[in-house]
């Protein structure tokens, strides 16, 4: 009963120890027509680490090193980082106060890459207004809708980089 008032008084809150429940600015993103976003608390917590340019520079350097080693064996590296649900739907959060903007994909975009890079966030964002349930409403995983979009993108990259 202690936490009961927050369901009526707060728009954005940590619903329990693990899940945030925040207002969206549209009810069109999920097939259940909810204007709420449920996401795992560690999505928000990991944003600080994922937004650190030094971490991204280091990651990219390691991936470029791996790419060079794989090239010696005639293997091409495809890197496809996945946005978490918080990152994917951040732009649709109605009140962003207290919610750090995820910039991992912006930082990755600026890197010089020797590997094949698929910006899965950009690929999925291009479909978010025309296809509902990119991520499941009540889960942290992307749905079969997103899986099909990403599979087609991977297939295209493989065909273009033979």
Across the structure, where does each feature detected by a protein language model lie?
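Extracellular glycan-modifying ectodomains
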Residues: 1-162
